[in-house]
Amino acid sequence: MQLKYKKGYLRNGFSSTAVSFKGKDTLASSWCAVKTINDAIHGQFRIDGVREHLLSTPEMNKLSHIKQLGLAHLVFPGAHHTRFEHSLGVSHVAEMMAESLGLDGLEKDTVGVAALLHDVGHGPYSHTLEHILHERGGLDHMSITEGIILGDYDVLREGEESSVPERKSVPEILENHGIDPKEVAGLIRGPDAKGSERNLLSWTEGRTNFVENDKTKAHLIHGPVDCDQIDYLLRDSHFTGVKHGIIDHRRLIMCLESHGGDISVEEGGLPALEGMLVARGLMYSAVYFHRVTRVTEVMLSRAVERSEGYIPDSFDLQRRVDAEIWQVLHEAGDFSRDMIRRLKYRQLLKVCLSRRKQDLSEEDIRLLTELASDSKKRMDLEDEIARRAGLEPGYVAIDVPNIKLLLSEPRMSQVDIRIIGDDGKTRWFREHTPLAEALRKRQVSQAVFYVMTIPGFEGKVSQISEDILFT
């Protein structure tokens, strides 16, 4: 087979090499461009074939305008990285994992594509507004991602088509490269309906299959140890400056094995696995659920909640990027405009009341869980507290952060993974270390709820909230 190379530079700044294959052509086109990515986390790596074609789609390029950590840059000044670079990194890690697991060529392409596309369903500010999409539309970003991959959801808004001439859809590109869109969508969703890991509850020894169908590829994309988590821990740690997320990912990947229909870890990789799971818990406490990060997210979400009628419906909202939703909210009324300005100039709400789980009765927990799942009841209670404190509606906010964890990171409770011993038998991670049980029980956020208000009203709002909620 002869190869011809044509070097050039892409408009997005990636260096590119086009490769022409003479001989049997298995691709949609005889020309296959190779992009060399210079990444802050993984260094230099290449993207080619179907993944290179996907990089030119609106679905992928939209992610360049959505911050990975939402408003966390107001707490961690370096956290301006985007979903786009994260997706590139996840695809690279998936390639490394696929190589270690011994997957064949088509399997590598399939998991590489699933990794690259795993976040295309995200809307503005990533997880910050996801609960609104879930409440109003019954969907999450993974459902939107599935729709994009299967051709059931278009990220372009009305009138934008003319700016993207000769566009090919995601499923069309996949099919042209011999990849099944349904398989890709299934890998991203996870092995069960909600990405849960039901098959991990079984246990056996040796090489008997753990599950009826091989879940190796599915868990590479969405499982207790997957390419998404490895990249976001490393990337978010780097850009926030919080070192808890630094993990020995190369050692961990080297010790992965497809064993009995699932991903297992060789015993020599146990310290690296322990390090990753501990890092995940610490990063959620120190970064993702940092108290001030939560304040900024609550301020933005309340601005959206109280602008219904002025902003797009939940499905159209997902088509926007960060800057667009900011502009929409600025024009959506006095309250939303004030929240946006407060975020712009970092004049944030203040936490005036919080509680740890051990300080709450069963009745208290029931009430807070109800408030977290019923936004109307929560808003009515917030407005009653505000009224008694002499504030306008919206200037008191109640936040139950652990409920948000169910939408943003359903894998947090998945800490049990099979370890392959030198005798060839598999044993649970929990049989090797007490860390498994400790991590499963560990609370991400020490406070299970917060009450926030504008500066100067903390004492009054705290007392009124205490009286209403706990007496």
Model feature map: region roles:
Residues 9, 301, 311-471:
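Terminal helices and disordered tails flanking the catalytic cores of nucleotide-processing hydrolases
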